[in-house]
């Protein structure tokens, strides 16, 4: 069952140099088998991006109205208390993505888009996740994903089929 995004979830933007338009969407769903899926689609009417590498990292959890970093991200000096606008949220996503790549943090799930531009990643529990894609070029386009933060909350898990 496809479920709503929380207020922190936002669409993953995939840009193609030739198309100069946003490609992509992201859907969060939960199944009866306690699996939380993050489905990423990288295509529009004219362009499909296959073999795009994606990873998700659990970076934090909600603590009352704010988020706190957890796990391997807990010691990073990042202010998680002010997500009042998209630019601040994007700055945090960019910073966490840089830390994850620089420090070699192991993602919760990884995958590559198939011939239809689709990939299904798995999350292990409720929390704040970083969705990160790897840049690459093929013969027709340059793929440069923007890291995003999504919250998988208890309501998404509770509403599973």
Spell out what each predicted region is.
Residues 2-161:
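Solvent-exposed loop/turn and edge beta-strand elements of beta-rich ligand-binding domains
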């Amino acid at each position: 069952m496809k479920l709503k995004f929380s207020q922190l979830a936002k669409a993953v933007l995939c840009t193609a140099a030739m198309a100069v338009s946003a490609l992509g969407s992201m859907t969060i769903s939960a199944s009866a088998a306690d699996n939380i899926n993050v489905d990423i689609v990288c295509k529009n009417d004219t362009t499909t991006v296959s073999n795009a590498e994606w990873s998700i990292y659990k970076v934090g959890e909600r603590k009352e109205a704010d988020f706190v970093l957890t796990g391997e991200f807990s010691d990073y000096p990042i202010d998680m208390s002010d997500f009042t606008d998209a630019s601040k949220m994007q700055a945090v996503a960019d910073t966490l993505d840089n830390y994850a790549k620089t420090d070699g943090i192991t993602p919760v799930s990884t995958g590559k888009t198939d011939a239809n531009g689709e990939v299904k990643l798995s999350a292990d529990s409720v929390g704040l996740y970083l969705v990160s894609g790897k840049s690459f070029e093929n013969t027709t386009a340059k793929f440069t994903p923007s890291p995003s933060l999504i919250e998988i909350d208890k309501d998404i898990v509770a509403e599973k089929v």
